[in-house]
């Protein structure tokens, strides 16, 4: 496709839809600067193992729903700086990409998105997912957004604002390995939103103050930062907010350093929660690694200086 001129194309909907035997695809020469629609573009490209769309522009993009649906063999997806900042519908964008082990969304803007239904549904090999670039202020539906992400262990939703959401049904359903969901202390689901089975099957989930998964509480009732027995929840305070007071500052960095180098805090009843919030880095590709070191303290200090606090 190296000679294909797409400079005036406005729609690429269904372009490779149902190319079920396609094993390789080079779209590096595509000019997508005028393209408004990419819905179902690579849908059911079941044998593709890698795809590079890092050259794609999302400047004009309005719809990207089911763009990579059921690319079942896809192990590597390079999005580069591709960002659907103007797109409103991201429904099922990566649904069924069950072989993806990682996905770099660090430059992925969602400022206009209103629908994230099933966005990562069935991405059963994803172990980590960095969504810190996401803006969800306008999102009304996250139904089954992470459903079946059974390898996912930690999820940082610190940037998520679901105050406009009307449907969060099955949002984390069957995320059986999910241990920790980080969120801003202000995180809340609007009263009246549909939330049936929001946490159903999240059998490994533990809130920041130790509240363990209970099959009797799987709706939005526990979709809040865990405050223990008085206000149980399945979420943990924002990563780096070590003392859990809703602010990220130099005090948190100092506590993290003390945890790393002394035994000063180990007798406190909230030590486990503090340890979890201090463990912000160290794993391959970023994220918590089960240890607190001086590097965690330095990372928290840097975040505080940059004003990234809750």
What function would you assign to each model-found segment?
Residues 1-238:
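Negatively charged
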Residues 235-310:
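Cellulosome-associated attachment modules in secreted, modular CAZymes
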């Amino acid at each position: 496709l190296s000679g294909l001129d797409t400079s005036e194309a406005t729609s690429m909907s269904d372009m490779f839809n149902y190319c079920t035997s396609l094993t390789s695809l080079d779209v590096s020469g595509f000019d997508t600067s005028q393209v408004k629609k990419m819905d179902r573009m690579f849908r059911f490209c079941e044998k593709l193992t890698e795809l590079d769309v890092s050259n794609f522009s999302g400047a004009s993009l309005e719809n990207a729903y089911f763009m990579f649906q059921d690319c079942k063999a896809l192990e590597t997806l390079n999005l580069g700086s591709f960002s659907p900042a103007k797109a409103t519908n991201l429904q099922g964008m990566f649904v069924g990409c069950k072989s993806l082990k990682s996905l770099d969304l660090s430059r992925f803007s969602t400022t206009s998105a209103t629908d994230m239904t099933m966005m990562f549904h069935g991405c059963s090999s994803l172990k980590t997912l960095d969504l810190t670039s996401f803006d969800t202020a306008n999102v009304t539906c996250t139904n089954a957004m992470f459903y079946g992400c059974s390898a996912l262990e930690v999820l940082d939703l610190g940037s998520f604002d679901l105050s406009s959401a009307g449907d969060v049904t099955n949002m984390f359903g069957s995320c059986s390995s999910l241990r920790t969901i980080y969120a801003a202390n202000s995180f809340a689901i609007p009263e009246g939103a549909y939330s049936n089975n929001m946490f159903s099957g999240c059998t490994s989930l533990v809130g920041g103050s130790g509240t363990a998964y209970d099959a009797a509480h799987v709706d939005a009732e526990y979709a809040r930062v865990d405050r223990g027995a008085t206000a149980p929840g399945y979420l943990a305070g924002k990563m780096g907010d070590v003392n859990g007071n809703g602010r990220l500052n130099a005090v948190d960095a100092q506590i993290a350093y003390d945890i790393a180098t002394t035994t000063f805090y180990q007798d406190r009843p909230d030590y486990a929660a503090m340890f979890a919030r201090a463990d912000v880095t160290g794993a391959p590709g970023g994220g918590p690694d089960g240890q607190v070191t001086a590097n965690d303290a330095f990372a928290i200090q840097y975040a505080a200086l940059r004003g990234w606090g809750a």
